[in-house]
């Protein structure tokens, strides 16, 4: 009986370890809430999805500097156990400024630039 428990515990440990070993790189989408108008206030959104494990850093940048007033949704997960999160702030597009979303996941940094709608 004792060896059965040992095998069951070992099997459970291996199963949990395998779940922790699965990683999925994030997909990043950067977009404005409304079509961009130079000089008019808008919302800048960065939607990060399909990532695992859930530990992640997401920053919105203006000219390479972290933007103030950034808000983020709760971390949520999908049916496949990957996670997603929306990060957003108010911004005013201009011809001189660049806006980006910087994501660091599992030690890998990705930066996606916002492009105005045409």
From Swiss-Prot:
Residues spanning the signal sequence: 1-21
Gene name in the database record: B2M
PANTHER family per record: BETA-2-MICROGLOBULIN, MHC CLASS II-RELATED
Pfam family, one: C1-set
Matches recorded under InterPro entries: Ig-like_dom, Ig-like_dom_sf, Ig-like_fold, Ig/MHC_CS, Ig_C1-set, MHC/Immunoglobulin
GO cellular component terms attached to this protein's record: extracellular region; late endosome membrane; lysosomal membrane; MHC class I protein complex; MHC class II protein complex
Protein's GO biological process: antigen processing and presentation of exogenous peptide antigen via MHC class II; antigen processing and presentation of peptide antigen via MHC class I; peptide antigen assembly with MHC class II protein complex; positive regulation of immune response; positive regulation of T cell activation
Similarity field: Belongs to the beta-2-microglobulin family.
Keywords carried by this UniProt record: Disulfide bond, Immunity, Immunoglobulin domain, MHC I, Secreted, Signal
Source organism of this protein record: Ornithorhynchus anatinus (Duckbill platypus)
Task of the protein: Component of the class I major histocompatibility complex (MHC). Involved in the presentation of peptide antigens to the immune system.
A GO term, aspect molecular function: peptide antigen binding
Residue ranges of every copy of the Ig-like C1-type domain listed in the record: 26-113
Locations listed in the record: Secreted
Disulfide bond residue pairs: 46-101
Source taxon at top rank: Eukaryota
Quaternary structure (record): Heterodimer of an alpha chain and a beta chain. Beta-2-microglobulin is the beta-chain of major histocompatibility complex class I molecules.
UniProt name for this protein: Beta-2-microglobulin
Gene3D superfamilies per record: Immunoglobulins (2.60.40.10)
Lineage of the organism: Eukaryota, Metazoa, Chordata, Craniata, Vertebrata
Matching SMART domains: IGc1
